[in-house]
């Protein structure tokens, strides 16, 4: 026996096993924070794939775009946006900003418009303790599919049965007019979807006006270009303000570093670029916090002036207090 007897018993070779099974699932995507005395909750509607960036950002050079994307450790052959729905509890009102893609237009149209990872807002809101019946105002930044198609279900029933819907008169008229089913292929489903969703609330529509409050503490600000009636919303409580910027800028690198680049889904790309540059400049100068619908989850942060454009500075996520 000798030295061999002193060795510990070694079992025969066995396949390696993990100490726990792989979960292969994600937790609900919601985040809560404070804006003064208001309580804000961001809930994800999922990811929105746009495909290769070159046809989407129309007046940019491929070389410059590739350099920016590589510098941000992003793929150069695909563009994927987040969709960050915001709910603000003012103590008197529970306001949802934009509805996500929803299911109103059926599985095929929803997948064609938003890809396979969208329409998750309601599940994430419920996980955060918020039900559709509690919402008393849906403030729509504009009437595109990923912002208003969640107002009704596939049968046309109201998803938010106790809510009014705030939208600009310009967007309401434009996106419910069959005469605008021309130009890019997306125009026909966008118009059909807006008609179905906004039409269901025709007796509960509130027309937003530039500079006017939709409820105390929440002010609509015109930001035209992406659509004719696109608005952002300034949310103020105490000495704190966060601006929900809707689709002012879709990409946190390309349209922030290069705000004058154009986006193919803009109704008026040049006006959109001017509006974006002007507002980002104001946010940077005034150190205004913003919540962007399409920036990386949860979309909360600031912009800082950098060269001919700006840089996106995300707010660190606080997981211990509401702030």
For the regions a protein language model found, what residue spans apply to each?
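Conserved beta-strand hairpin/beta-sheet module of binuclear metal-dependent hydrolase folds
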Residues: 29-128, 232-248
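Cap/insert and terminal regions of metallo-dependent hydrolase folds
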Residues: 114-115, 119, 123, 234, ...
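Divalent metal-coordination and catalytic microenvironments
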Residues: 37, 88, 98, 135, ...
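Active-site metal-binding loops of divalent metal-dependent hydrolases
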Residues: 45-46, 99-102, 143, 170-171, ...
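Active-site metal-binding motif and surrounding structural segment of the metallo-beta-lactamase
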Residues: 77-78, 82-85, 112-166
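Histidine-centered catalytic micro-motifs
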Residues: 138-148, 224-230, 291-297
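Metallo-beta-lactamase
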Residues: 116-130, 134, 161-222, 271-278, ...
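N-terminal export signals
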Residues: 1-19
């Amino acid at each position: 026996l000798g030295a061999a007897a002193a060795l510990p018993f070694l079992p025969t070779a066995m396949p390696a096993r993990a100490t726990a099974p792989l979960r292969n699932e994600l937790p609900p995507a919601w985040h809560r924070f404070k804006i003064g005395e208001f309580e804000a909750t961001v809930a994800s509607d999922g990811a929105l794939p746009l495909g290769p960036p070159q046809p989407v950002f129309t007046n940019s050079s491929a070389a410059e775009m590739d350099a920016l994307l590589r510098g941000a450790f992003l793929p150069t052959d695909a563009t994927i946006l987040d969709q960050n729905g915001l709910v603000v509890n003012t103590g008197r009102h529970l306001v949802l900003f934009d509805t996500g893609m929803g299911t109103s237009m059926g599985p095929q149209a929803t997948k064609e418009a938003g890809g396979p990872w969208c329409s998750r807002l309601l599940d994430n809101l419920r996980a955060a303790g918020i039900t559709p019946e509690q919402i008393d105002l849906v403030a729509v930044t504009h009437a595109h599919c990923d912002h208003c198609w969640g107002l009704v279900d596939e049968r046309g029933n109201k998803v938010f049965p106790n809510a009014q819907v705030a939208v600009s008169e310009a967007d309401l008229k434009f996106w419910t007019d069959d005469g605008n089913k021309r130009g890019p292929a997306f125009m026909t489903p966008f118009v059909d979807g807006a008609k179905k969703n906004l039409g269901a609330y025709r007796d509960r529509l509130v027309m937003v006006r530039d500079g006017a409050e939709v409820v105390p503490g929440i002010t609509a600000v015109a930001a035209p270009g992406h659509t004719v009636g696109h608005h952002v919303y300034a949310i103020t409580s105490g000495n704190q303000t966060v601006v929900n910027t809707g689709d002012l800028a879709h990409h946190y690198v390309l349209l922030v570093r290069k705000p004058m680049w154009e986006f193919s889904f803009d109704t008026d790309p040049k006006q959109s670029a001017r509006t974006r540059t002007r507002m980002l400049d104001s946010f940077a100068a005034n150190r205004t916090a913003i919540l962007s619908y399409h920036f990386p989850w949860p979309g909360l942060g600031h912009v800082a002036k950098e060269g001919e454009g700006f840089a996106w500075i995300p707010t660190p996520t606080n997981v211990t207090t509401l702030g």
